[in-house]
């Protein structure tokens, strides 16, 4: 609403909403749930093992012994690719992203299309955040996301706004995130601060290499006004 209807700068409004979300979650966990020690163990998803396939050495536990949301996320990749590049609705989204004024001349409602896209993307981002506590860490505490949303933005840029590319980018960045956890658990002779930095340093390095070559939608970040 702030960026679409009120036409506020998307970077500024996004940063403000991010700060509000951090403060609001901290408030709710203390006031509503009565949490005092800043950490709360939550009900969580258990891994789902695919019969026989999960017993395959090495790749079995990696591919066929994951949480249900992981399988849903993998299934969404081809579904979203088909929707975006092979359906009329996907063409409408692409058109509004490139030139909303031209889209309006052929009967497309740019504001409604943007609202639908923002709501769906926000729901998917929220599911990813929920999985962090419900599927991976099994607890909730302040600022546990630790900037992973910005890594997700980097994944979109790296993927050039393509769901298949986003899957590859997320596997790379997710692998870097997992590596820093594994490295600390293995007791590597590396200061843990450097291990914590690794996913973010890798993100910056990749953005430096591919960021200038990745061209997003022409109208991204630009408010639309009815003529």
Q: Model segments located where?
A:
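Cytosolic-side transmembrane-helix boundaries in multi-pass membrane proteins
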Residues: 98, 105, 109-112, 183-227
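Transmembrane alpha-helical segments in multi-pass inner-membrane proteins
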Residues: 136-200
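Transmembrane helix-bundle core of multi-pass membrane transporters
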Residues: 22-86, 187-195, 214, 221-227
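Short loop segments and helix-boundary regions at transmembrane helix junctions
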Residues: 1-52, 86-88, 146-147, 151-164
